């Protein structure tokens, strides 16, 4: 026991004693648990109050009663070799809801949030408690030790103790005991997708496959593989390359089993985060890779995924993309489609979007590749000068990952037989971080509207615009009504930001609205810092929306532990698809 003297100050958001000196040593050999018993981890529900609760106790030991409830599956951060699990106390009302699938922490505007009328912004959900691995690493003398692979709805049956730590803007309890886990309900059975009826219905899906890169070193790409020198905007290390061929194959297998299994093999998938590399083609049912760039205008990883789907008992898929849609590090959006039901139509020079004179009426100057005749086709434009960039931006174009527009014919009874439906699909991957790049993301919505308007003017009534929009559906928003943001420089903008507003105003129907009305407990696609949220959506024109039979989210990723081999076809991505 010692007495110190110093000045209390803040340094990089940490409260510290500076200019500290030792005054005296009062005692030695003190039993820590006797003299300073662990405080109870009972944070207030209000987020601001919860921050004060934790900050006042920074560095102190905490006790968490047995039977705490997991609200976010274990996440793992490779850069720090750390894992984290978010929980709430077992005596919190959320943990005791009658429907076990509602025992989640929903963002404030969600209908199943803990308080307030639906759509309101209220307490910020301060009841969340973060458990991390540093204490376990210290006790095991092994810096690779991770906290147990909890999944959402698990119960931690043992009591936990640990010291309070602050890093990356979060307070966490560095637990000294491994959580003992008992599984709750299976997240994958939370209102899962159903099978489309052959010959009567067809299914579309969005799917962010989370950095689906292979282990091939693309000789035509300077930022593709460890040891490459880098390229403009991208510097080593390239941590999106899988650690081994086995890791890559496991990623493919998990995705394939999901698509062939609980997703029921949708007719058309709008894919995000595939690698743009194209040095391979499929020959006799196997990958044939060489030293020819742009080998067959199909992304290699998605061709390999199509083979894995076939191995998993699914149908045969083909894939297509426009490589102009890739960003600097090689991420691209694309399409996968069943060859027994879906036909990718030939590119038409007269097409209002895919042709050589697209009629996309947008106020920014179109990029040169917009005039290419291609199906699918990436489209982009210069970012207009008047866009508010106070919250940041990516580059000088509207998109860093341009949307892919594809024209498909969906046949009821096989290609070339009977009745068909023509559909335009737009695969989107908007700029990341909902509370940043606000002006740019709003323009990305407006550009989608311009594409749909061009198609509508030409009589193409059926359009689906889907993907990872990286912001929330109405009424959710990164900024509450009246909240100031983007204040550097002044004047501030005032919330809500309504970044998807152009899509709603144009009359497009967000299928999430149907999902949340029918199965609100299942209306989400992502889990961030212990709160579920929706980033992945599909917007439909009225002609397409009229025929909607069902929309469901497949919860076999966001609720399952990362880097855990014990879950088959679970946790293959950090996003859940909608079907």
List each model region and its residues.
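N-terminal, active-site-proximal structural segment of metallo-dependent hydrolase catalytic domains
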Residues: 124, 174-334, 340, 370-395, ...
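Extracytoplasmic/secreted proteins, especially bacterial periplasmic and envelope-associated proteins
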Residues: 3, 61, 65, 250, ...
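Sec-exported extracytoplasmic/periplasmic mature domains
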Residues: 4-13, 19-27, 67, 71, ...
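Extended non-catalytic accessory segments flanking core domains
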Residues: 1-236, 251-253, 356-402, 441-444, ...
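Metal-dependent phosphoester-hydrolase catalytic domains
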Residues: 148-166, 170-172, 177-191, 339-402, ...
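Extracytoplasmic/secreted cell-surface and envelope-processing proteins
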Residues: 12-15, 214-216, 277-287, 296-298, ...
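Residues that flank catalytic or metal-binding motifs in active/ligand-binding sites
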Residues: 58-62, 125-127, 200-203, 329-332, ...
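Solvent-exposed loop/turn segments at secondary-structure junctions
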Residues: 9-12, 23-24, 136-137, 209-214, ...
